[in-house]
Amino acid sequence: MNDINPAFVMPDVQSSPDTRQIPIQRVGVKGVRYPVTLKTPAGIMPSVGTFNLDVHLPADQKGTHMSRFVALLEEERAPLELSSFRLMLDKMLEKLEAEAGRIEVTFPYFISKTAPVSGVESLLDYEVTLTGEVRDGAARVFLKALVPVTSLCPCSKKISQYGAHNQRSHITMNVELAGELPVEALVRMAEEEASCELWGLLKRPDEKFVTERAYENPKFVEDLVRDIAMRLNADDRIVAYVLEAENFESIHNHSAYAVIERDKRVD
C-alpha cells in the first residue's frame, strides 16, 4: 500500500536547528547537466548547461533543501540571457529562503563564421560561463569566454630565414559586467587581437590567408594579454576582469602563459 495518511506530516530535518553554530558560506549542488536555450543575436540557440548552484546556510540551520535547486532549473525554461539569469538568481534565493547565493552555468556557444576568402560558412564553438552571485545584499554578474586563436612567435620569425613556429592558443576572459555585453562582442575582442582567428571550415585559399595573416601579425603571449587588456579597459560595460592567455607551444612540451587582472573600481 502506498497510501499516505494526510494527518501524517513528514519531518523537515533540513530546517531543524543546529547546535554547532557554524555558518556554511556555500552549500548546494554541483555538475547538474540540464538543457538550456540561449537568446543570441542570431536567434534562439539550444544548448546543454552544466550548473553549479549554492546558497549561504546560517549557523543555526542544519541543512539546505537540495531538491529545490533542481526544481528551479525545471521551472526556469525561458531563453537564457543576462536579464533572465539575474531573475533566476533572485528566484533561487527566494525558493531556498537564503540571503546569499550563487549560480554558475557553463555551456557550448556556437557562432556562425564566414571564411575570409572563399566565403563558406561554418560554426565554431566557444566555452562560455555565466556566473551570478548575491553577497551582502549586492548582486554581481560575470561573463566568461574561452576563445581559441592562433599565435605566431615574433622571435622565431625574426631569427629564421623562413617560417616561424605557431600554435593554437586559448584566451580566457572572465569579466564582471556593469551592462549588457553580447558573447560575440567579447569573443571578437580576443580574435581581433590574436595573430589570427580560427574557423571551422577553410578552403585552400582560406588556408593561405590564415597562414600569411598569422605570419604578418606575430605576437608573444605577453602581447596577447596586453592588447586584449586595452580593449577590456576601454569598454565601460566591464568593471573588472581576469584575462588569461595560454600558448600550447609547438616547439616545447609545455605552454607559455600570462595573466592580467584589473578591477576598475579600485585603480
Curated annotation (Swiss-Prot):
It is an enzyme of class 3 (hydrolase). The gene is folE2. Gene3D superfamilies: Urate Oxidase. Belongs to the GTP cyclohydrolase IV family. Converts GTP to 7,8-dihydroneopterin triphosphate. The keyword Hydrolase applies. GO terms for biological process: tetrahydrofolate biosynthetic process. It catalyses: GTP + H2O = 7,8-dihydroneopterin 3'-triphosphate + formate + H(+). Its EC number is 3.5.4.16. HAMAP family: GTP_cyclohydrol_B. The keyword Hydrolase applies. Transmembrane segments: none annotated. This is GTP cyclohydrolase FolE2. Pathway: Cofactor biosynthesis; 7,8-dihydroneopterin triphosphate biosynthesis; 7,8-dihydroneopterin triphosphate from GTP: step 1/1. PANTHER family: GTP CYCLOHYDROLASE MPTA.
